[in-house]
């Protein structure tokens, strides 16, 4: 019988530390709900003491989820622990995650503390946390660069103080699989407790070994894996949870362990994170990439047609990828469109479907057929516009002279107020973005601008992702439209809208 491996998702905390990623309040809540639907055991919803926004989003998630444990991060500071308590006290299963660095380089250069000081801090703060929480998780930051004898002392101190979950972070992605497994074996053999202790792995991908190290940790005695959807995170990212879960599923013969994830929700979860993070999943990404179940070679195609297992070790359906797509066209009616939405896993009320159907018909008039990816894109674009504080109303462009373009942009807020301005620039995009900046009265720096086609062909919809720097803060925006310039404007307006929402500001004019 397979043993249960718990999944601890830190997409909303460690994942959001990805450069350029800044989830809105609504996006965090939607992500948490999808993670619960996916079946993760614990969601690290944020770092409540770090900001008012983080506190409020953790609190909202704690009050919304019904089955998943909600965890908040805390340094070895009582005020941090208090913040987690206040944010998660209404959760069905509240958890606090207390951490302190333990490696020589961190003690000397960051904390300016001795080993004795660190041990005393662990004892004091884990003891305090245990007075407020039934479940306390402790992490010795940079554990894999900590001397093993001292690491054992740190963990034993935390366990004696009441921690029942011990997480071993490979903070800078430094370890390799045998070494990492050995750390877990040493801890499970050396640390004593009258309580059951769950050991957890938290791996970063700086050397490309986050997933393999996570699996090695299981062989060493870990019973929980921490990571993020799509592997997003600081620097090179974290262990991709979908890869860990499918590795355990497919190679159960070796690991003898399984997660409780609803694997059919995997692709949907990945797509949601990709959309909100503004990070496109690479086509060749394991499990959820567009090419994960594609076969180009004639030999491979022949083999798959004869027997799928010749070149596929898992089915697309296992992770929620449909292989029987029936495209819609301009003659398709409301009923067919509604049935397509259900088939794609969407539960959308009739009123919202009316607007989506209008968008579908507009696209169907321009394309020979509308694919599932087009439908997903319509819904994604609609969600973004519905959630936004401001959205693009109209865009007009005119050629001036000598390469200069003129743009007139009209933006509408949720209350129906209209804001309009115009500008010129050396090209359409520059003119559009100058006009939007004038509307919001902000000086911005465009850090990244990316265009992707939703499907193949010249009639494909365009997805535009932008990253802006506004008053020292990075925000991302997403826009989708058949017209690249419209999509570009929508993305830029959304980025400004996110900044305005986070700062509770109103634009002028």
Swiss-Prot record:
Residues 391-509 are annotated as: Regulatory domain. GO terms for cellular component: cytoplasm. One of its GO terms (molecular function) is manganese ion binding. Mn(2+) binds at residues 14, 202, 204, 238. One of its GO terms (biological process) is L-leucine biosynthetic process. The keyword Nucleus does not apply. It is found in: Cytoplasm. The keyword Nucleotide-binding does not apply. Its cofactor is Mn(2+). SMART domains: LeuA_dimer (SM00917). It is an enzyme of class 2 (transferase). Residues 5-267 form the Pyruvate carboxyltransferase domain. Disulfide bonds: none annotated. CDD domains: DRE_TIM_IPMS. Keywords: Amino-acid biosynthesis, Branched-chain amino acid biosynthesis, Cytoplasm, Leucine biosynthesis, Manganese, Metal-binding, Transferase. Pathway: Amino-acid biosynthesis; L-leucine biosynthesis; L-leucine from 3-methyl-2-oxobutanoate: step 1/4. InterPro entries: 2-IPM_HCS-like, 2-isopropylmalate_synth_dimer, Aldolase_TIM, LeuA/HCS_post-cat, LeuA_allosteric_dom_sf, LeuA_bact_synth, PYR_CT. HAMAP family: LeuA_type1. Catalyzes the condensation of the acetyl group of acetyl-CoA with 3-methyl-2-oxobutanoate (2-ketoisovalerate) to form 3-carboxy-3-hydroxy-4-methylpentanoate (2-isopropylmalate). This is 2-isopropylmalate synthase. The gene is leuA.
């Amino acid at each position: 019988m397979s043993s249960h491996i718990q999944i601890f998702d830190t997409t909303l905390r460690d994942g959001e530390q990805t450069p350029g990623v800044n989830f809105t309040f609504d996006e965090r809540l939607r992500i948490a709900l999808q993670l619960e639907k996916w079946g993760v055991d614990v969601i690290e919803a944020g770092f409540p003491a770090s900001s008012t926004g983080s506190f409020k989003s953790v609190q909202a998630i704690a009050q919304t989820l019904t089955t998943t444990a909600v965890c908040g991060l805390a340094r070895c500071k009582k005020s941090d622990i208090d913040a987690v308590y206040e944010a998660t006290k209404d959760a069905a299963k509240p958890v606090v995650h207390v951490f302190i660095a333990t490696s020589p380089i961190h003690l000397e250069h960051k904390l300016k503390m001795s080993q004795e000081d660190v041990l005393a801090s662990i004892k004091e703060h884990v003891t305090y946390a245990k007075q407020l929480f039934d479940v306390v998780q402790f992490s010795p930051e940079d554990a894999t660069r900590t001397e093993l004898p001292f690491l054992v002392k740190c963990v034993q101190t935390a366990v004696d103080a009441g921690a029942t979950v011990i997480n071993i972070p490979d903070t800078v992605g430094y370890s390799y699989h045998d070494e990492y497994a050995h750390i877990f074996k040493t801890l499970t053999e050396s640390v004593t407790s009258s309580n059951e202790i769950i050991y957890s792995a938290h791996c970063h991908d700086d050397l490309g070994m986050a997933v393999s190290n996570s699996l090695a940790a299981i062989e060493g005695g870990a019973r929980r894996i921490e990571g993020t959807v799509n592997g997003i995170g600081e620097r090179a990212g974290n262990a991709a949870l979908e890869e860990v879960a499918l590795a355990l599923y497919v190679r159960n013969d070796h690991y003898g362990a399984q997660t409780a994830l609803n694997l059919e929700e995997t692709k949907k979860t990945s797509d949601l994170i990709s959309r909100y993070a503004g990070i496109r999943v690479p086509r060749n990404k394991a499990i959820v990439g567009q090419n994960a179940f594609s076969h180009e070679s004639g030999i491979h195609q022949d083999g798959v047609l004869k027997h799928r297992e010749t070149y596929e070790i898992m089915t697309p359906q296992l992770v929620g990828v449909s292989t029987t797509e029936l495209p819609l066209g301009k003659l398709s009616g409301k009923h067919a469109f509604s049935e397509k939405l259900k088939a794609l896993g969407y539960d959308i009320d009739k009123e919202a479907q009316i607007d989506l159907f209008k968008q579908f018909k507009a696209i169907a008039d321009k394309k020979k057929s509308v694919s599932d990816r087009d439908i997903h894109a319509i819904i994604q674009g609609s969600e973004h516009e519905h959630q936004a504080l401001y959205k693009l109303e109209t865009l007009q462009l005119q050629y001036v002279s000598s390469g200069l373009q003129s743009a007139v942009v009209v933006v509408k807020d949720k209350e129906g107020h209209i804001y309009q301005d115009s500008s010129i620039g050396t090209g359409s995009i520059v003119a559009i973005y100058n006009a939007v900046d004038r509307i919001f009265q902000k000086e911005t720096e465009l850090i990244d601008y990316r265009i992707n086609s939703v499907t193949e062909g010249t009639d494909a919809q365009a997805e535009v992702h932008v990253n802006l720097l506004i008053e020292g803060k990075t925000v991302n925006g997403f826009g989708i439209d058949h017209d690249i310039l419209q999509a570009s404007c929508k993305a830029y307006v959304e980025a400004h809208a996110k900044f305005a929402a986070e700062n509770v500001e109103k634009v002028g004019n």
